[in-house]
Design a protein with these regions (language model features):
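N-terminal short beta-loop-beta anion/metal-coordinating cradle
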Residues: 1-66
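Proline-aspartate-enriched helix->loop->beta-strand connector
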Residues: 67-72
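Short, well-ordered amphipathic alpha-helical segments that serve as non-catalytic structural scaffolds
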Residues: 58, 62, 123-127, 212-220
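His/Asp/Glu-rich mid-to-C-terminal helical/loop segments that flank catalytic regions of hydrolases
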Residues: 196-220
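A C-terminal functional module that forms or caps the active site or interfaces directly
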Residues: 148-204
Length: 220
C-alpha cells in the first residue's frame, strides 16, 4: 500500500522521517518528498506548511504526483476536551472547520455545497483504534481553523459551536476537504501537545517539543 503522510512543520516532519527505512528524497515543484518503508508499506512523506491553504496545496500536489492509496495528516494539536492529556492521540472520526460561516442556509462550519463534517475513512479509523500501545487513542471530532488557539475564551467559543470537539488544529479540515473532492481515503491522527486555556499553556507546548515529541510520533 502507498500511504501519503502530510505534516505542517519541520519538527513534525523530522519525527516521522526518523521512522522510515530505505529513504529516498524527491523534489517536485515547490515540495520535497521523502519516500520510505514501514511494515511493507510505501510511505510518501511531505511537509505542507502551516494553515489551511498550505495544507490544501500540499495535499493536491501529493495526490497529483504520487496517487497514494490513502492520506494521513499527522502532527500536533491542542486538546479541547477534559478527557485529553498531553501526549494522548486523537484519530478523526470526523472533521469540521471552526472558522467558516457561509451565511443563512448553511450550518456553521460548512462550506456551501460541501458536507459540514468530513468523515475519517472507517477502515483507517478502525486501524487507528486497534493499535495497542501505552498511548491513549481517542476517536472523535477535530476542529480546524486558521488560528493557533491559546486562551479560554477562544476555546469556549469553539466548544459552544461544537461541544463534541476533542482537538483543534490548522490543517486537518482542508486536507480532509481535498481528499473528499479527490476521493482519497483520509484520516487525521493528531498528538496532543497542549491544552488551550490552561494556565501553563505555552509551557505545555514547549515542554512537549523539548521532552516528549520523540516518544509520541511512533504511534502514527
Amino acid at each position: 500500500m502507498k500511504i501519503g503522510i502530510i505534516t505542517a512543520m519541520s519538527s513534525e516532519h523530522d519525527q516521522v522521517a526518523l521512522l522510515l527505512e530505505n529513504k529516498k528524497e524527491y523534489t517536485e515543484g515547490i515540495y520535497s518528498y521523502t519516500e520510505g518503508q514501514i511494515h511493507n508499506n510505501t510511505i510518501i512523506l511531505t511537509q505542507c506548511g502551516i494553515g489551511k491553504v498550505n495544507a490544501a496545496a500540499g495535499a493536491v500536489e501529493l495526490i497529483r504526483n504520487f496517487q497514494p492509496d490513502c492520506i494521513i495528516s499527522t502532527g500536533v494539536a491542542g486538546g479541547i476536551d477534559k478527557c485529553l492529556k498531553v501526549m494522548d492521540v486523537v484519530a478523526s472520526s470526523h472533521i469540521v472547520y471552526h472558522d467558516v460561516w457561509c451565511g443563512e442556509g448553511n450550518a456553521y462550519g460548512q462550506i456551501q455545497g460541501l458536507p459540514t463534517y468530513f468523515e475519517g475513512h472507517p477502515i483507517l479509523l478502525n486501524c487507528a483504534m486497534s493499535i495497542h500501545t501505552g498511548t491513549p487513542i481517542h476517536n472523535g471530532l477535530i476542529c480546524s481553523g486558521d488560528k493557533f488557539i491559546t486562551d479560554r475564551k477562544e476555546l469556549n467559543e469553539i466548544k459552544g459551536n461544537f461541544p463534541e470537539g476533542l482537538a483543534v488544529d490548522m490543517e486537518s479540515g482542508s486536507i480532509a476537504q481535498i481528499c473528499y473532492l479527490y476521493k482519497v481515503p483520509f484520516i487525521s491522527f493528531r498528538i496532543i501537545s497542549d491544552t488551550p486555556g490552561a494556565e501553563n499553556h505555552w509551557e505545555q507546548y514547549t515542554n512537549f517539543w523539548g521532552e516528549m515529541a520523540n516518544r509520541s510520533f511512533g504511534v502514527t
